[in-house]
């Protein structure tokens, strides 16, 4: 059975072939049944397609293979027990199933200077340090925004919490794993958290597009 994502991609590709929409991804598709993918988040429509230049390479800081460890050490595949690790296709499916329907958020957990330099289209900036429950004045408002409700006993009720897919710079970056661990420490359901371990480095390595937030 085709997933909702595959069905959407098939429909979009059919529109492009019929002339009802712009032709996309002539040579480099995302997947065999996915030449490109479009989604609308908070009123903005994004087209995700890979760089069509088969000679393209990564440039800039994400082209580096080695960083001092610690602190930039390779992270395990699993950020925490019960948290599913995903790749690029699962990220797009998450956007289709949860972000477009307002049931979830694609969270860029990096500090704002990284976010401002370029992020995955449709993501929101919620830096990892916002999820530190100790001495952070923004902690309660942020968790409330995610659907958490603070109970009279000081614990959180996450029955209506959003599904979150968190990412940072790559397998060597600790920002999204730290955010995930802090969320779990206050009772956020692990089954509502996903971890895109590849992060920005893998996203760029696949030739996928980034955007700079408006006003930057």
Predicted regions and their residues:
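Catalytic cysteine-centered active loop of the rhodanese-like fold, especially the PTP/DSP P-loop
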Residues: 146-201
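Active-site neighborhoods of enzymes that stabilize oxyanions during catalysis
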Residues: 206-216
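Short, solvent-exposed loop/turn and secondary-structure capping segments
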Residues: 117-121, 138, 176-180, 206-207
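Mid-length scaffold segments of soluble, non-membrane domains
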Residues: 95-162
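Bacterial N-terminal signal peptides
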Residues: 6-18
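Positively charged n-region of N-terminal signal peptides that target proteins for export
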Residues: 1-5
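Solvent-exposed loop/turn segments at secondary-structure junctions
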Residues: 111-115, 130-133, 170-174, 199-203
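Flexible, polar/low-complexity N-terminal or interdomain linker segments that lie immediately upstream
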Residues: 23-117, 216
């Amino acid at each position: 059975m085709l997933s909702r994502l595959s069905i959407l991609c098939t429909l979009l590709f059919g529109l492009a072939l019929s002339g009802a929409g712009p032709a996309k991804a002539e040579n480099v598709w995302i997947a065999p049944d996915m030449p490109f993918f479009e989604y609308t988040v908070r009123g903005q429509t994004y087209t995700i397609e890979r760089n069509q230049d088969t000679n393209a390479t990564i440039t800039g800081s994400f082209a580096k293979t080695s960083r001092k460890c610690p602190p930039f050490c390779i992270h395990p595949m699993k950020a925490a027990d019960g948290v599913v690790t995903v790749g690029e296709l699962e990220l797009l499916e998450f956007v289709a199933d949860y972000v477009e329907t307002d049931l979830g958020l694609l969270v860029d957990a990096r500090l704002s200077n990284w976010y401002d330099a370029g992020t995955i289209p449709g993501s929101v900036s919620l830096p990892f340090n916002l999820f530190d429950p100790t001495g952070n004045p923004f902690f309660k408002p942020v968790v409330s925004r995610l659907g958490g409700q603070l109970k009279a006993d000081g614990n959180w009720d996450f029955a209506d919490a959003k599904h979150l897919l968190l990412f940072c710079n790559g397998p060597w970056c600790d920002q999204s794993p730290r955010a995930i661990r802090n969320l779990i420490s206050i009772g956020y359901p692990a089954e509502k958290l996903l971890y895109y371990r590849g992060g920005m480095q893998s996203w760029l390595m696949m030739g996928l597009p980034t955007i700079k937030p408006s006003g930057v």
